Design a protein with these regions (language model features):
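The feature encodes the CheY-like receiver
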Residues: 58, 86
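Acidic catalytic/metal-coordinating carboxylates
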Residues: 35, 61-64
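Acidic, metal-coordinating helix/loop segments flanking the phosphotransfer/catalytic sites
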Residues: 32-50
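Short amphipathic alpha-helix used as the core "switch/output" element in two-component signaling
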Residues: 41, 63-75
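Two-component/phosphorelay signaling modules centered on CheY-like receiver
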Residues: 12-31
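C-terminal output helix
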Residues: 88, 106-115
Length: 125
């Protein structure tokens, strides 16, 4: 598929799983980042159609990076990911501008359904 997806996660295994799932869903234009600083650079230079953003990074452990991305591109399609799926974290992520939240570990089918849902919902607006 043509859409470019940025996967931001400091855990190598989590990135590999997400990328494999995205490839299985037909996405092959994928860029990666492992820190907030790297994610900012890639976000600005690559202009991704969708961002999968882990909430906890070595240099960012809250919603600061999400808020920065939304301030730079208010129309950004960002899905937060985390192994900590507490209601408050999910609510705060959505309030800050995330389009969805995916708890890790995830099942590939549900993961891809959420990806397509966010991409399609945004395209209809």
């Amino acid at each position: 598929m043509e859409q470019k997806i940025l996967v931001v996660d400091d855990a190598r295994f989590a990135r590999k799983v997400a990328i494999k799932s995205l490839n299985n869903g037909g996405f092959d234009n994928i860029v990666q980042a492992t820190t907030a600083a790297e994610a900012k650079e890639v976000f600005l230079n690559e202009n991704p159609d969708l961002v999968l953003l882990d909430i906890t990074l070595p240099d960012n452990s809250d919603l600061t990076l999400l808020e920065w991305m939304i301030s730079v591109r208010p129309d950004a399609k960002i899905i937060m990911t985390s192994a900590i799926a507490q209601d408050l974290i999910i609510e705060d992520s959505i309030k800050a501008g995330a389009k969805a939240f995916i708890a890790k570990p995830f099942m590939e089918k549900a993961f891809l359904e959420k990806i397509f849902e966010v991409l399609e919902a945004e395209d209809k607006q």
